[in-house]
């Protein structure tokens, strides 16, 4: 699905929902991206959610809100949320916000 220039695709791996997000996550796009993700999480109620953010080339505080809101949503269902293969831009803002203490960052790809 493409919304506001962002590409969001979903992949289910057993009890894990992998959400691939590409493009920019800012105040212009975050609401549309968040709405689609929330609908998918609510319908599937996965035990694990992985936000795969290797294709995100820009993220501002709206992106941090998107991650933390999904973290809280998944936690309500007893699940966990991780950030998978974040781009350097995403890692930078997550670390600046101190969020790596709350949300695990997983890497399956070698650093770029």
Model-inferred region functions:
Residues 1-57, 72-112:
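STAS-like cytosolic regulatory interaction modules
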Residues 67-71:
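Histidine-anchored nucleotide/phosphate-binding helix
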